[in-house]
Amino acid sequence: MRQALPLVTRQGDRIAIVSGLRTPFARQATAFHGIPAVDLGKMVVGELLARSEIPADAIEQLVFGQVVQMPEAPNIAREIVLGTGMNVHTDAYSVSRACATSFQAVANVAESLMAGTIRAGIAGGADSSSVLPIGVSKALARVLVDVNKARTTRQRLTLFSRLRLRDLLPVPPAVAEYSTGLRMGDTAEQMAKTYGITREQQDALAHRSHQRAAQAWAEGKLAEEVMTTYVPPYKNPFAEDNNIRGTSTLADYAKLRPAFDRKHGSVTAANSTPLTDGAAAVILMTESRAKELGLHPLGYLRSYAFTAIDVWQDMLLGPAWSTPLALERAGLTMADLTLFDMHEAFAAQTLANLQLLGSERFAREVLGRAQATGEVDDAKFNVLGGSIAYGHPFAATGARMITQTLHELRRRGGGFGLVTACAAGGLGAAMVLEAK
């Protein structure tokens, strides 16, 4: 593995993250039912700019992501620029890296800052599981294309007569990997069995996540980084995540049946992330530009790493691969971290990654490293809960984690934090953050 250069501009400026914000996260078909991702993105970027009081023309680039894309708005980033009153000349493009999408957006803006092409930009992501591109069957799609080219009514009727009743049924978005046909939950089940992770361990982690997230809200720790939203019919504000089960008990988790391997499985709806709607964004600048504008950064981006592994086995081990690389590039070890935040796609996936981060054998035989990355101290791990509790609007999760970790680092007097996530396609992402 090749060691990267420090994340600084040509002038030696660090990459500052000056602010971050997100919408509350809502379970599918609840508070944001009928609100498309592009509107959620406009909400959060508009409010982020208003709160920051940064001159509108100071933002030179917006990189935004959306995993479940809508055909009518394929470039969500540009639609956000045009829909929030930003300067129409602002460069804007969209990215997608599955569950690590806003990690990618942040990396892209950081690269523009390091290249010197911009001095300030916004990165983020939004997704809606309530507004989905419902498709049609391949047979109907082909006929519709041919009908559009038909010249006579008779030709059109002949084409339609080829269809069977089942060809007319709507086709929901695929939930399986395109290359393998496996669902993420299938891989989570495989990892639970491979690494000996029990149902009780998974339920305990999920319960911990909900308890810590509920406590974070109760103590007011999230109020500054979560906006209040108003959606049609504008009768009631929506200000807090609605997936968190603050009063649940471990016995409640034990009642649920396995969701993927019905007979022998351990992965349930309760120890997995739910389908969620939401958006999140961060403002990045060069350190000198932040000083010019009189801004006090939340913190700095010290390093990042993206990795890719095979999709047939252990597809969700991205954090175990990307974490050591990000630490190496930051010049740090696991012991140097104040906080370690991992995306909880599934409790099984999270526990498997934690196990392998501390495994000498995995480090030597799989990663080709001399020693294990290191055990993750429970006192530093997902201290405010994780995605199982908050929910997971695919493209927004990374920006949530970055903002949340920087705020918590500042509350603790500063230090280093690492945020990491697995993603579909065997991808992994990790970023090292620094705050004072």
Swiss-Prot record:
Cellular localization per UniProt: Cytoplasm
Catalytic reaction annotation: an acyl-CoA + acetyl-CoA = a 3-oxoacyl-CoA + CoA
Active site: C99 (acyl-thioester intermediate), H392 (proton acceptor), C422 (proton acceptor)
Keyword set includes Ubl conjugation: no
Superkingdom of this protein's organism: Bacteria
Entry EC number(s): 2.3.1.16
Transmembrane segments: none
Keywords: Acyltransferase, Cytoplasm, Fatty acid metabolism, Lipid degradation, Lipid metabolism, Transferase
UniProt GO BP: fatty acid beta-oxidation
Enzyme's top EC category: transferase
Any GO CC annotation of this UniProt entry: cytosol
First-listed, main subcellular location of the protein, grouped into a coarse class: cytoplasm
Entry GO MF terms: acetyl-CoA C-acyltransferase activity
InterPro entries: Ac-CoA_C-AcTrfase_FadI, Thiolase, Thiolase-like, Thiolase_acyl_enz_int_AS, Thiolase_AS, Thiolase_C, Thiolase_CS, Thiolase_N
Any Pfam family the entry gives: Thiolase_C
Pathway: Lipid metabolism; fatty acid beta-oxidation
Chain's role: Catalyzes the final step of fatty acid oxidation in which acetyl-CoA is released and the CoA ester of a fatty acid two carbons shorter is formed.
Annotated family: Belongs to the thiolase-like superfamily. Thiolase family.
Subunit structure, interactors included: Heterotetramer of two alpha chains (FadJ) and two beta chains (FadI).
Name of the molecule in the record: 3-ketoacyl-CoA thiolase
Originating organism: Salmonella newport (strain SL254)
